[in-house]
Amino acid sequence: MLACKFSQYQAFIMDGVKLLGTCALIILLSTTSTVVGRDRITFTPIEDSAGLMFERMYGLRHHTDDRFVFVKKFNFVSVLQELNNIKSKIELYEAQVSTCTNVRQIKQNRSSIIKARIENQLQFLTQLNKNLITYSVESSILSNDVLDNIDLEYDDSGEFDVYDEYEQPSHWSNMTVSDAQALLRNPPKDRVMFLDTVTTSDVSSKYEEYINCIVSNRTVENECMFLANMMNVLNDKLDDAAALAKMLERIVKQTRKNKLNISNTVIDDDTLLTEMKKLTQTLYNQNRVWVVDFNKDMNSYFDLSQAYKLHLYVDLNTVIMFITMPLLKSTAVSFNLYRVMTVPFCRGKMCLLIISGNEYFGITDSKNYYVPVSDNFRQDCQEFTGYNEFLCPETEPIATMNSKVCEIEMFMGRYSDDVDNMCDIRVANYNPKKAYVNTLIDYRKWLYIFPNTTVSVHYYCHDALVEVDTKVSPGVGVMFSTMAQTCSIRITYDVTITVDSRFYVSHSTTYWPKKKFNFNNYIDQMLLEKATTSFIPTVDNFTRPVLLQLPHKFHIKDYTSTPHHFFHQSKIYTNSAAPDEDSQDDSNTTVVIIAIVAAMILFCGLLLFLFCCIKKRCHQSNNVVVQYKNNNEFVTICNNLEDNRAYINLPNEYDSDDMPKPLYPLLGFNDDLLKDDKPVLYPMIIERIK
């Protein structure tokens, strides 16, 4: 009895242990999944006062105007002639096999079909020979079944727009008709290599001895054997011709895609690499090098086709392939390609935004030289994933010392005394309740701006079925996909981001100079935080095209310089303001006034004197309203266009915000405040530039 109870108790304990173990495992897996999931997308805060941030995207090298050309010929004269002979022999022998039972039958139109396949490719290639050959290919022939054992899977149409004879020959990748004709007519002694020509004479020559043998041994008694052997030979010739037709189709298709592979059976990237390596020293003696560095390891993304351009022409019945490649100077310096991103400096409802002169630039490792890079560099340059770089046309490097370029000076960590003239600083309103996201690297890295509140971010990664909810603190930062993956990130109901980082060679890196630009060194952010303006636009996003359209420029110097007991007029405030009126001191005219009206003239002079004083003190005639907080009190400056006066509003601390005090003119304001050592107001100068 006791043994039975002990056994039950032991079983109960074991079940409890198993249950606890299962729960612990589930919790562990859940925790691990959460940690791994959170590591997939990272959120890194940055200082929003930096003005600009610099993202290294790729390497950058410059190619010369020189190039190297490989030439490969494919002669189809022999096979086209042989196909005509095969057709006539099939017709001849087919009439003699009626009495033989073991002779293989060949459809008479098979040779015509293969011939049509070849001619169909030739007719769409640009002719280099003035004596043009016109091929008339019957569509009914091409629509029949191709009677060979080679599968064809081509979806390309017959229009080969890659062969444009009107291309400009200035770029290494261009090869016009005139270029091709000149090269064939008078080949250069260097930087051109003719590869072995592919001939089609084997279709007839390799069977010649065997055919002579069976013909010489032909007798009446072995007539059926002769016919069987001859039909087998003709069928083998047709198989060879069909293989050549397939080779041509492959060559044409690969030229269209600008990618050679061994499926064409004659030439591929490995063949080119072998020939290039043989010529390395020869080029080096000419102060030139290949794009490929044979001393470096080739990564899994290496693709030689990114460093060549294929061109296909035809000269009578000979197809000619030209493979053009760029050349670099052996002394060429490598650059790092950076993208410049504006970091919004937002306080209250207003943002200050530095716009760089160039969105992209390249700079050497030593940081001694830089080159501007076009916004369209992806079209102007060639990406080479083998080294995670772009190959661009040669550009003269510029010294970074005293560049007087905003983004370069900030990249070098140098402060300028003339920020207003060197940098383009725009001002805009924004919605502090909205979340903003700017793309740094397509589908992989973003700059986020979450102004005032913590944001809940939800993302789901499809490849690992990972779903994560995370909280991101308010501020500015970088959102980054840490691995090759596809995800969907939802930040708010109207902001969704797609992540696809599977095809990136390496991570981009954010660069911060040791001495970063800091808006706080120029601007009192507490004053800016309470400033509001109604005349500048509100932006929906902070992308570069939107920022370039902002019509108002912010002047740091005017903002940080304190007034000397008056509001200095700025002529840049002329959006819709009335023009200034010239005033003249008419005090000298009083000496000629008649004595009987002296009292009246004196009174008028006094009024004129008071008017000039008011105009001098209140010298901003525009419709701008600027509010800010100083010493815990709101001060409102309002300029009226009609009477050209500045007004100050000092609400009582016990008054409601919705019931402001009446405005009092500056003229009636206590002059002791203006004489205080600590100025009560800072001017905010905003220029309309568009």
Curated annotation (Swiss-Prot):
Query: Where does this one sit in the cell?
Result: Virion
Q: Which residues form the signal peptide?
A: 1-37
Domain of life where this protein originates: Viruses
What stretches pass through the bilayer? none
Keyword terms: Signal, Virion
Q: Which GO terms describe its cellular component?
A: virion component
Q: Pfam families in the record, alphabetically?
A: Baculo_F
What InterPro entries does the annotation carry?
A: Envelope_fusion-like
Free-text function comment from the UniProt entry: Pathogenicity factor that accelerates mortality in the host insect.
In Swiss-Prot or TrEMBL terms, this protein is called Protein AC23
